[in-house]
Amino acid sequence: MKKVLGIGNALVDTLVKLEDDAFLEEMKLPKGSMQLVSQDDIVDIERKCEGFEKSMSGGGSAANTIHGLAGLDVETAFIGKVGKDELGDLFADDLRAKNIRPFLMQGESHSGHALAFVTPDSERTFTTYLGAALELNPEDLQDRFFEGFDYLHVEGYLLQNHSLLQAILEKARKNRLKISLDLASFNVVEENLHVLKNWVRDYVDILFANEEEAKAFTGKDPEQALEEMARLCEIAVVKVGKGGSLVRAA
């Protein structure tokens, strides 16, 4: 079986179940987006949603994918950076409990923390304090992390750090890994569109997007977006919620 390495923001997720969109509107959070906030802000927002049903676990986009693969008995590992605190320990323990090899470094900031607001239609809206996750840098990317793996799964949120993502892609290519990229959030796609298209064309083998991200990436509806995405990489996937996924191989 193929071995998969993940890299992304090492975050602890607090999942908050909402009954409707009212709280998102009150907090001025665009539904389906990811908004970066300070540590003080995320503490304040979490305090304001005390009455909602919540659960906590190790998270982050790429880490969640790696957890899913580990649950299917795929050999996996994850690269990230956490703080020297309880949340960092929770994140590392969560990886080990699923037999995921933790390639984790420790930063100076507090561990990253995300509030994931889930509405009844299963749409997720994030407010994220990146903390130590933001300190991951090209010098942290040791060749030994990549050795022996067949695929690298990268989260699109790393688009916000161009030098880091460029180094990741080059390191993966050097070690002959296939590269899988999940676009992560439509607003991140919009803010980095030009460089993103170049990276997909030059490095990415498998590209994932939901309907909003595919629209932001191509300006087209899912079926047409899939065709355009497939012209840039080997396999394109557009996730369409309850409708499953559209897949096209080049």
Regions found by a protein language model. Give the residues of each.
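A general structural signal for well-ordered alpha-helical segments in protein cores
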Residues: 62-66, 88, 165
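A glycine-rich beta-to-alpha transition motif near the start of alpha/beta enzyme domains, typified by
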Residues: 43, 50-52, 75-103
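Hydrophobic/aromatic pocket-lining and membrane-interface residues
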Residues: 65, 69, 78, 95, ...
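Glycine-rich phosphate/adenosyl-contacting loop at the front of the ribokinase-like
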Residues: 1-77
